[in-house]
């Protein structure tokens, strides 16, 4: 899904992509910045309604991105432990502790 990839891209703006850095979630782009970015992604010719739909999809996938990569890190910790030198469980903690994850799970159940 393109919207999932874009949500992941925006979270990467926050850093914390390695095991030693704490993500700075305040770096997540504002709604206006996200909209401008999506308009550019769609070539600047998309109808405003199409941009709105894509932005809403990005917002839906944003917490799922944390869930996906957090669970990925847990499985990597179980499979690899510390053999790679990467602290998977710390990374998982960073991703899974974001408030949007609990909100998304709460809406789903």
Place the predicted regions along the sequence by residue:
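Regulatory N- and C-terminal appendages and interdomain linkers associated
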Residues: 71, 76, 80-109
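Acidic, serine/threonine- and proline-rich low-complexity regulatory regions
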Residues: 47-60
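Active-site activation/catalytic loop segments of kinase-like enzymes and analogous catalytic loops
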Residues: 3-48, 63-82, 98
């Amino acid at each position: 899904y393109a919207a999932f990839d874009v949500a992941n891209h925006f979270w990467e703006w926050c850093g914390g992509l390695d095991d030693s850095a704490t993500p700075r979630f305040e770096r997540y782009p504002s709604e206006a910045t996200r909209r401008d970015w999506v308009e550019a992604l769609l070539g600047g010719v998309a109808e405003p309604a199409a941009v709105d739909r894509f932005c809403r999809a990005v917002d839906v996938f944003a917490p799922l991105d944390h869930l996906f990569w957090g669970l990925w890190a847990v499985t990597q910790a179980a499979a690899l432990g510390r053999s790679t030198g990467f602290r998977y469980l710390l990374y998982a903690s960073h991703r899974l502790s974001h408030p949007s994850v609990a909100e998304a799970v709460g809406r789903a159940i």
